[in-house]
Amino acid sequence: QLKDLDSVDKKIQRCEKMAKTDPKAKVELEVLQKCKTHLEQGKSIRSLDLSKEDRTAIADSFLLTEKPVMYVANVDEASMHTGNKFSAMLVEMAKNEGAEVIVMCNNIEAQIAELEDPADKAVFMDEYQMKEPALNRLIQSAYKLLNLETYFTAGVQEVRSWTIEKGWKAPQAASVIHTDFEKGFIKAEVIAFEDFIKYKSEAACRDNGKLRIEGKEYLVKDGDVMHFRFNVLNSSNTYYSLLLFL
């Protein structure tokens, strides 16, 4: 907050000179003054009620406390499910910022991470009445906060996950594997995650009509299992095509 307050003060000084003749600078100055008052009260900019236009006006100020955050409360084993008075205080504070709080016991999480056998992990978590490691919730919340999602490519040798931004279309999603996949994108074979889990294999999904052919406008969904077809011109002026199976 102190860093942002310093940045806002400097920006206000510049805008005051420009605001006399520049309407945009005048708008920015008004928003910056709101931000200064808010920061002086010990509050973060992300908790300030600003319109989309207001936030656009101060976008180039790159204020740290405007960025969304997530809090992680490390508690003891006895408090891992219910939290304690300290994590409750954190939750209350986070409400004002619209932020999420993940309550977890790092000691337990470390022990889970050391167990390589899935059966051993299941037994260990059952002893602590855990359905899944808290680390899973942490990762999922971080992805949500950063507006990210995952799709998969599944082949005989391995299954791989790829991270993309929400709202990306199939060609953009393909580009994280290789830029040629976006340039020469033809189509994508898509299986929904739930269908892949239910039918266990690509062949079974195909037999049950759960494999779809999607084009360039397809919006990739979180968990999609995808194969890409593309066609590009190489340096020898010849075409090569590929159906990706990783």
Residues covered by each model-derived region:
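Hydrophobic alpha-helical signal peptides and transmembrane signal-/tail-anchor segments
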Residues: 238-246
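Intrinsic-disorder/low-complexity regions
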Residues: 223, 236-239
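C-terminal-of-GTPase-core extension/linker across diverse P-loop GTPases
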Residues: 14-219, 226, 231-233
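Conserved P-loop NTPase nucleotide-binding/switch module
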Residues: 1
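Conserved phosphoryl-transfer catalytic core
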Residues: 5-9
